[in-house]
A protein has these predicted regions:
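A helix-coil-helix interface module used to build multimeric assemblies
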Residues: 2-201, 207-222, 285-286, 296-300, ...
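Short beta-alpha connecting loops at secondary-structure transitions
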Residues: 21-25, 71-73, 283-303, 325-340, ...
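Amphipathic alpha-helices that form helix-helix packing interfaces
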Residues: 40-43, 126, 130-133, 137-140, ...
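Glycine-rich cofactor-pocket loops
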Residues: 142-164, 276-292, 325-332, 357-377
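Active-site-adjacent "gating/activation" loops or surface patches in catalytic cores
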Residues: 211-242
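A conserved active-site cap/scaffold subdomain adjacent to cofactor or substrate pockets
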Residues: 241-274, 283-344
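Active/binding-pocket-proximal capping segment
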Residues: 276, 399-406
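Long, amphipathic alpha-helical stalk/connector segments used for oligomerization, subunit docking
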Residues: 307-393, 399
Length: 481
């Protein structure tokens, strides 16, 4: 069969990066199994198991990377067990050490510990891309911190903000996601050596009841695999708690939530013609409508985010249905749900890196939309100016209300521009000239502390993140489609 006559996940062909695909590849998985077998043998030897020698450990180390997949595949056809098939294949390459591979361990020693290690690698890559996005949004927010634009509540015009201030809202949610990823990384623990039901009974047998040696084995393996020696779960059944998977996928889904919010806002702004995602020179928006400039990258962010947020249900239900010390109905679901959750998060961030690197703003449209609404928003200032010239505040308030209703009707029912200023100018109750009225129509006067908030946010929140992760700033992504 060729790649064209079988199903291949779009994550592999269209969306996810090569780096994330490798992290969840068989090669990374089975190399990690072998590294864990080396770490186990070394730790057991160091704690006094005389049947394990330095030559055996060296032999195992020499064959960590040259995996004889064909042997493992053929063996699995016979024994129907993936771990024992790879134990056999490894033993074929390491005849001296064949008899001590996997000593005292159960399948979850390699399976679960590898899952934790792989998820840590995935979280680190996600974290790197989050920082890259924050750097780009910070640059954008700084550039546009002073540009007034309409803010919307209920998707209706509210009060002016600035383009840069709105960008800080997007960035701030991603900062929250980064904190959650950091928390997951900081609290991630290996399963360690726990045996078939978590009691470590097999290791008590190996070490003649010496619990200190078992604890030392756990610490040694954790250290060799790049974890703090104390970062081993204190208790477990056969597996580490599947709540860990649920916690991690929830953190990834949080990224999906933030990115969907960003992408949805940008799709709406594209409809308003205020902002757009990058549009390539030869990009086609529609097969039927040549003029179309569809926000397809942001639409894809929304689509993948929806998938990621729904995927959260898988580990949640799995965690709740783990009977007693474990059941195997976690396995098939976990293989799909966790890997694709990471691939989805990676794909979303790839697109967001690309989009945030080339956001397009149309300043004249942005200002025109503000000016179309500003007469309504400036009504209180106009009223105060008229009162200072001798007008009656209560009468002027009612007349402004009537003018606003009439002007809104002109806009909505007749499709004409907002004529509220002309109505106020013609009303003798106000006694204001056109110049006096227009003096109150500066958008910048209505943006409050927007620009200052941007400066403070970038200085106090974003810059410390960028300073601490300088190597992750400046990422550039080319999308496959």
């Amino acid at each position: 069969m060729s790649q064209h006559d079988r199903y291949i996940s779009p994550f592999s062909t269209r969306y996810a990066s090569d780096e994330m695909q490798y992290i969840f590849s068989d090669d990374n998985k089975f190399r990690t199994w072998r590294r864990l077998w080396v770490a186990l043998a070394r730790a057991e030897m160091d704690q006094g198991l005389t049947n394990i020698t330095p030559d055996m450990v060296a032999e195992l180390e020499a064959h960590v990377d040259d995996i004889n997949y064909e042997v493992a595949i053929e063996r699995e056809k016979l024994v129907r067990h993936d771990v024992m098939s790879h134990v056999y294949a490894y033993g074929q390459q390491c005849p001296k050490a064949a008899g001590i591979i996997h000593l005292g361990a159960t399948s979850c020693y390699v399976g679960d510990n590898t899952d934790i290690i792989v998820m840590r690698q995935g979280l680190e890559l996600v974290r790197k891309k989050l920082v890259g996005v924050l750097a780009k949004l910070a640059h954008f927010a700084k550039e546009y911190k002073d540009m007034p634009c309409m803010a919307y509540t209920h998707c209706q015009p509210a009060q002016p903000t600035t383009v840069g201030k709105r960008a800080t809202l997007w960035a701030n949610e991603l900062v929250m996601d980064l904190a959650e990823i950091d928390h997951r990384l900081a609290t991630l623990q290996l399963r360690g050596v726990k045996g078939t039901t978590g009691t470590q009974a097999s290791f008590m047998e190996l070490f003649k009841g010496d619990a200190d040696k078992i604890r030392a084995v756990d610490a040694s393996i954790a250290k060799e695999m790049g974890f703090d020696p104390k970062a081993v779960v204190p208790v477990s059944g056969q597996t580490y708690s599947r709540k860990v998977d649920a916690f991690i996928l929830n953190a990834l889904a949080g990224i999906g939530q933030s990115c969907m919010k960003f992408a949805t806002d940008l799709r709406l702004l594209a409809n308003f013609k205020e902002m757009e995602e990058p549009f390539e020179k030869n990009q086609i928006g529609s097969s039927a409508m040549p003029y179309k400039r569809n926000p397809m990258r942001c639409e894809r962010i929304c689509a993948l985010s929806r998938y990621l947020m729904v995927d959260v249900l898988n580990p949640a239900i799995t965690a709740g249905t783990q009977w007693f010390e474990r059941t195997l109905d976690d396995s098939a679901n976990k293989r799909i749900a966790m890997a694709e959750g990471f691939l989805a998060a990676d794909a979303i961030l790839n697109i967001l890196l690309n989009v945030s690197d080339g956001l397009v703003v149309y300043p004249k449209v942005v200002r025109a939309r503000v000016m179309a609404e500003l007469p309504f928003m400036a009504s209180e200032n106009i009223m105060m100016k008229a009162v200072k010239k001798g007008g009656d505040r209560q009468e002027l308030h009612e007349r402004l209300r009537e003018h606003a209703v009439a002007a809104a009707a002109v806009v909505k029912q007749e499709g004409k521009p907002n004529d509220m200023i002309a109505r106020v100018e013609a009303d003798p109750a106000f006694g204001l000239t056109r110049e006096e009225i227009e003096a109150e129509l500066s958008p910048e006067a209505f943006t409050g502390r927007s620009a200052e908030q941007v400066t403070e946010f970038l200085r106090d929140v974003i810059q410390p993140v960028l300073d601490a992760n300088a190597e992750d700033v400046g990422q550039h992504v080319e999308l496959n489609v």
